Amino acid sequence: MYAVFQSGGKQHRVAEGHTVRLEKLEVATGETIEFDQVLLIADGETVHVGAPLVAGGKVVAEVVSHGRGDKVTIVKFRRRKHHDKKMGHRQWFTEVKITAINA
């Protein structure tokens, strides 16, 4: 059984027991969180596709940790002008473990 849900403007395909990194959520470590924006639920035999959301669909997850991703380096450069600018960015994330998928 798997589901596709939306969080942080992105869609994630998950199954029970999977660990997923999401955009930072203001939830304490160890707490459970419910995602009700479920777009699709498949249980092996049938596929329930929402229009746009599955009615009564819910994905339950437990917050494992918070952290920051790998550094992304941004370089801006102007040719022949002795001008360059180097910046870096590390995105915050929340890691969750999927505990249940309810149709």
Swiss-Prot record:
InterPro entries: bL21-like, bL21-like_sf, Ribosomal_bL21, Ribosomal_bL21_CS. One of its GO terms (molecular function) is rRNA binding. Pfam families: Ribosomal_L21p (PF00829). Keywords: Ribonucleoprotein, Ribosomal protein, RNA-binding, rRNA-binding. The keyword rRNA-binding applies. GO terms for cellular component: cytoplasm; ribonucleoprotein complex; ribosome. The keyword Ribonucleoprotein applies. It comes from the Bacteria. One of its GO terms (biological process) is translation. PROSITE patterns: RIBOSOMAL_L21. Part of the 50S ribosomal subunit. Contacts protein L20. NCBIfam families: L21. This protein binds to 23S rRNA in the presence of protein L20. Belongs to the bacterial ribosomal protein bL21 family. This is Large ribosomal subunit protein bL21. It comes from Shewanella baltica (strain OS155 / ATCC BAA-1091).
